[in-house]
Amino acid sequence: MTIALGKFTKDENDLFDIMDDWLRRDRFVFVGWSGLLLFPCAYFALGGWFTGTTFVTSWYTHGLASSYLEGCNFLTAAVSTPANSLAHSLLLLWGPEAQGDFTRWCQLGGLWTFVALHGAFALIGFMLRQFELARSVQLRPYNAIAFSAPIAVFVSVFLIYPLGQSGWFFAPSFGVAAIFRFILFFQGFHNWTLNPFHMMGVAGVLGAALLCAIHGATVENTLFEDGDGANTFRAFNPTQAEETYSMVTANRFWSQIFGVAFSNKRWLHFFMLFVPVTGLWMSALGVVGLALNLRAYDFVSQEIRAAEDPEFETFYTKNILLNEGIRAWMAAQDQPHENLIFPEEVLPRGNAL
């Protein structure tokens, strides 16, 4: 058959090859196959956010003003979550809630699901972009692996947490002050700061900041004095092949300071990768736990003793009371759909009240 029909040859003008050639061409801004996901999703997510913060009110979902048009500023404007009555609806523009009416869709909070879902896929597209470029230039994929950590945090906080609760309503709205409100909510209703996964996240982020500061200062401190420029930026050519700092000197310095030091650059830089990425992954796992209403550390024996003995108090029992105050103050305003009414005598009083 092969002799009769001839050898099969692939059409060189195959549509896939043409597309592949155009997408992966060397240009100022690389597109790639990942760009087919990244660029449209990022465009729609950012566009939805700018549209919402500029024009769209949160009156119908939260009883709040949330746009520049209503007098908010950059810190107080937000794209707010849908009302709790809409549960986990995707709130599609053409769905049964909005029925193709754009104004109604915005009033119902449709922009939040639009921004959240397109934002999640944009972040995934950016990670795939790093994979694709690394493969093209024959690098290992650690950049993409590292970027999976902020993606995990975004997905756990904005998508998985509200999926575990009664609706998108309990996710953070997209705004600065809105995120602060969400943090207070997390503390008051979940005691988040006493959650071991939050502790690991804080250790990872602050530890990474410390490592970056130490690493940058050490490299600057151990630069070879063989440049004739006035400062670091003038002394060396940015394209030179040879190193401009001494690892041996750095190792000796920190060995004297701490008694231990990194012996090679691979281990040093892997550690700088490992600390923040692991911290963010752990905090994302913790938020998944909160979605299921898992509790933080509970020191019940201290609570019982504090209830029995008015003179006994610890920072833990103090924080428990503060959390109760947050819940009492926030619940009525933050969950208007519940019609919660707290009598004046049960609300906590601060010195200013």
Swiss-Prot record:
Chlorophyll a ChlzD2 binds at H118. The modification Phosphothreonine is found at T2. Chlorophyll a PD2 binds at H198. It is a multi-pass membrane protein. It holds the Pfam family Photo_RC. The chain crosses the membrane at residues 41-61, 125-141, 153-166, 208-228, 279-295. Fe cation binds at H215, H269. Coiled coil: none annotated. The modification N-acetylthreonine is found at T2. It is found in: Plastid, Chloroplast thylakoid membrane. Its main location: plastid. It comes from the Eukaryota. Keywords: Acetylation, Chlorophyll, Chloroplast, Chromophore, Electron transport, Iron, Magnesium, Membrane, Metal-binding, Oxidoreductase, Phosphoprotein, Photosynthesis, Photosystem II, Plastid, Thylakoid, Transmembrane, Transmembrane helix, Transport. The D1/D2 heterodimer binds P680, chlorophylls that are the primary electron donor of PSII, and subsequent electron acceptors. It shares a non-heme iron and each subunit binds pheophytin, quinone, additional chlorophylls, carotenoids and lipids. There is also a Cl(-1) ion associated with D1 and D2, which is required for oxygen evolution. The PSII complex binds additional chlorophylls, carotenoids and specific lipids. GO terms for biological process: photosynthetic electron transport in photosystem II. InterPro entries: D1/D2, Photo_II_D1/D2_sf, Photo_RC_L/M, Photo_RC_L/M_CS, PSII_PsbD/D2. Its EC number is 1.10.3.9. GO terms for cellular component: chloroplast thylakoid membrane; photosystem II. A plastoquinone binds at H215, F262. 2 of the reaction center chlorophylls (ChlD1 and ChlD2) are entirely coordinated by water. Photosystem II (PSII) is a light-driven water:plastoquinone oxidoreductase that uses light energy to abstract electrons from H(2)O, generating O(2) and a proton gradient subsequently used for ATP formation. It consists of a core antenna complex that captures photons, and an electron transfer chain that converts photonic excitation into a charge separation. The D1/D2 (PsbA/PsbD) reaction center heterodimer binds P680, the primary electron donor of PSII as well as several subsequent electron acceptors. D2 is needed for assembly of a stable PSII complex. NCBIfam families: psbD. Belongs to the reaction center PufL/M/PsbA/D family. This is Photosystem II D2 protein. The lineage of its organism: Eukaryota, Viridiplantae, Streptophyta, Embryophyta, Tracheophyta.
